[in-house]
Amino acid sequence: MKKILVAEDTESNFLLLSIILRKDYEILRAFNGAEAVEICRVEHPDLILMDIKMPVMDGLEATKVIRTFNEEIVIIALTANAYDSDREKAYLAGCNNYMAKPVMAAKLREMIHSYLG
């Protein structure tokens, strides 16, 4: 089973994402960007759903760090900010794609499937 790391500090958002994905994927959790970096080093997930605004280290900084040791992993930025400038910042940090919250379950599954098959 493919592994997805959900880097999300808000419990309700994590639970929603987990419910959407747990049938088809093994779900890992990070509460902040620093944890996401460490889990990525150890667990080697196939894809990361990266919240942008998190404590300790934000999602953009975590993405930049992850890209220093893993250029292949798929990283999808998740944020409540749906501005074009936020999307551009996510891509510049190294994210493969971007989705505004609240996420639509079918759209998220489709996006993940396009990367993981």
Language-model segment annotations:
Residues 10-28:
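Two-component/phosphorelay signaling modules centered on CheY-like receiver
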Residues 30-34:
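Conserved Asp/Asn-Gly motif in the active-site loop of CheY-like receiver
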Residues 54:
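Receiver (REC) domain active-site loop signature in two-component systems and cognate sites
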Residues 103-112:
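C-terminal output helix
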